[in-house]
């Protein structure tokens, strides 16, 4: 059976339950944590394998072109945590720490880097630097608006 057929079957099975609870998430993690309950075991296993294959030798996750990218790493980590793929966390932690501490991040990569850093490493001098950089970035963006 093809991936999308299995996915559709899993979604239908979930939707057809007699009692469907509405989800009002405040965070992405609680929603993703429900994925293993919604999808069948074969699909969860396939997604786990995909996540592991997408991690590069650098420790981050590959974009569509195969290059390691913070944006893709953010989503890779969210999915890995939801599906309990713990093997990817330590290499990702090292990748994020190295990249954030040794690069000048801007735009979406700044935000992804800050989220990943606080999630994987925690609070320290670097996370405070990222926080100040984001505040500065937001102030500049607001002041440039008409």
Task: List PLM regions with ranges.
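Preference for long, amphipathic alpha-helical scaffolds in soluble/luminal domains
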Residues: 1-146
